């Protein structure tokens, strides 16, 4: 990181950190943005040391600008960062990224006007820096500098490793900057495998060449001396034109950029190949339950690159499906951020979702909610008087059960008072038996503390009419007991009543 961070130092670093990312925004550029730009340039096989000078930044901008229309959001962010860094190197005062882009556009327009004016004054197109790899030698002649083996090796390695994934297109655009049709054919011929894809590319090129011939018919009559013939579709593709003719068209006044036209046809064919090699639709990209949000975003934008749609449609897809296809945890966070949240804010908010710390935090919140609800219910008195009252079936007292009762065990059923079965097998649906073994209170007759039967006397007692018969006191008492207590006799429980003797 130290080498990357040494791009700016001192006063330039202070200027860099004062520039805002967006107009009237809160976030400003930091050192980490330079580190990120260096890593992105390494991905595109561009030397990151070019960021250290203004001329190097200008070269990077020249390579990235043609791919802005079809590039991803990361490519646009890289272009914006390099443009802002160029203004810092040139000591151009800017307040935000938009002002830096406006300054770059003004400078490019001025340089184009100067080049056109110089070409009109001198009568030749000596725009050396605009037409690399076509350079001017010491004799003032425009010559072609062949594409380097290092560039070809980088292109072949990308095709072998990526196999026409979406990032192949910006890589091809960067490596073929300013190339002639002959250079482009050399790059295509170095691809050994994937011949089916190469055949599809040839068909696309032939279709575009036929469309060019239809839109640019040949003018009748001879060609004026000193003028070049107009290129046909096959000339642009490099099959019926020589290298000198290609250089002549590209350096003529006005120039015909046959290299850029052919490059555009190739990129159109590569888009079709990428679509074939990446059959996954953007609708199928969904975040897994344990997948980090960063990996999900990488897969999303990689698939979005392969979509054959305009930039407006891609922006709508990003705003809609990026949040909609996230997992429930991330979706809850993203919806809370609102629709105006930036990608950086989304990734920061969803950082760590699905990991151990996030799960522990969710569990703690759930436990806190349960504890709070339980406390509220206790405060409301929902658990008041919930304790069950225990009563003994043996003695009838409260506070213990029959198993722990110290009183003598009552015989028979505790419910109906009859012997021969237990209470659990009792079929009597009445009330529980009292200590006498009888059901009380009885639904028939008088209460237990009243005399059960008391016949009204209609004549004098019987003994008054029995003259000569004597009855003992014990017989008299038994007779009284039977009359007073026909259902239950206390004598059976306590023997003879002493009070009656």
From Swiss-Prot:
The record marks 132-133, 363-364, 377-378, 434-435, 450-451 as: Cleavage. Residues 217-225 are annotated as: PPIA/CYPA-binding loop. The modification Phosphoserine is found at residue 148. A lipid is attached at residue 2 (N-myristoyl glycine). A motif (PTAP/PSAP motif) lies at residues 457-460. Residues 12-19 are annotated as: Interaction with host AP3D1. Residues 8-43 are annotated as: Interaction with host CALM1. This is Gag polyprotein. Gene3D superfamilies: 1.10.1200.30, 6.10.250.390, Human Immunodeficiency Virus Type 1 Capsid Protein, Immunodeficiency lentiviruses, gag gene matrix protein p17, Single helix bin, Zinc finger, CCHC-type. It comes from the Viruses. Late-budding domains (L domains) are short sequence motifs essential for viral particle budding. They recruit proteins of the host ESCRT machinery (Endosomal Sorting Complex Required for Transport) or ESCRT-associated proteins. p6-gag contains two L domains: a PTAP/PSAP motif, which interacts with the UEV domain of TSG101 and a LYPX(n)L motif which interacts with PDCD6IP/AIP1.
């Amino acid at each position: 990181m130290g080498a990357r961070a040494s791009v700016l130092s001192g006063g330039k670093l202070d200027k860099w950190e004062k520039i805002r990312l967006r107009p009237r925004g809160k976030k400003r550029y930091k050192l980490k943005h330079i580190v990120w730009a260096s890593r992105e340039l390494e991905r595109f096989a561009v030397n990151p040391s070019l960021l250290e000078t203004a001329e190097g930044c200008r070269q990077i901008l020249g390579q990235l600008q043609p791919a802005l229309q079809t590039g991803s959001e990361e490519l646009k962010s890289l272009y914006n960062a390099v443009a802002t860094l160029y203004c810092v190197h040139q000591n151009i005062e800017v307040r935000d990224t938009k002002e830096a882009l406006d300054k770059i556009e003004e400078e490019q327009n001025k340089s184009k006007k100067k080049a056109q004016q110089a070409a009109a004054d001198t009568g030749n197109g000596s725009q050396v820096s605009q037409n690399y790899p076509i350079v001017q030698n010491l004799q003032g002649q425009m010559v072609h500098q062949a594409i380097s083996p290092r560039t070809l090796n980088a292109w072949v390695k990308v095709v072998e490793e990526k196999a026409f994934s979406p990032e192949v297109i910006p890589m091809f655009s960067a490596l073929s900057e300013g190339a002639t049709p002959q250079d482009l054919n050399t790059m295509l011929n170095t691809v050994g495998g994937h011949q089916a894809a190469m055949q599809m590319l040839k068909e696309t090129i032939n279709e575009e060449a036929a469309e060019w011939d239809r839109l640019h018919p040949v003018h009748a009559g001879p060609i004026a001396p000193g003028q070049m013939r107009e290129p046909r579709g096959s000339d642009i593709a490099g099959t019926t034109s020589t290298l000198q003719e290609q250089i002549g068209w590209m350096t003529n006044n006005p120039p015909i950029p046959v290299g850029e036209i052919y490059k555009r046809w190739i990129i159109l064919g590569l888009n079709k190949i990428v679509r074939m090699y990446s059959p996954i639709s953007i609708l199928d990209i969904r975040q897994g339950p344990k997948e980090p949000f960063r990996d999900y975003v990488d897969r999303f934008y990689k698939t979005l690159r392969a979509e054959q749609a305009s930039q407006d449609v891609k922006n709508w897809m990003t705003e809609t499906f990026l949040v909609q296809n996230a997992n429930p945890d991330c979706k809850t966070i993203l919806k809370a951020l609102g629709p105006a949240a930036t990608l950086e804010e989304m990734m920061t908010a969803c950082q760590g979702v699905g990991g151990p710390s996030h799960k522990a935090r969710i569990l703690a919140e759930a436990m806190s909610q349960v504890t709070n609800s339980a406390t509220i219910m206790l405060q409301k008195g929902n658990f008041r008087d919930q304790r069950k009252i225990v009563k003994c079936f043996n003695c009838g007292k409260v506070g213990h059960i029959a198993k722990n009762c110290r009183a003598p065990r009552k015989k028979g059923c505790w419910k109906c008072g009859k012997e021969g079965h237990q209470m659990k097998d009792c079929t009597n649906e009445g009330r529980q038996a009292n200590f006498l073994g009888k059901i009380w209170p009885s639904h028939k007759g008088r209460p237990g503390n009243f005399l059960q039967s008391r016949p009204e006397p209609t004549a004098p007692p019987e003994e008054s009419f029995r003259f000569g018969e004597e009855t003992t006191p014990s017989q008299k008492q038994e007779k009284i007991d039977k009359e007073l207590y026909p259902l239950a006799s206390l004598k059976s429980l306590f023997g003879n009543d002493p009070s009656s003797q």
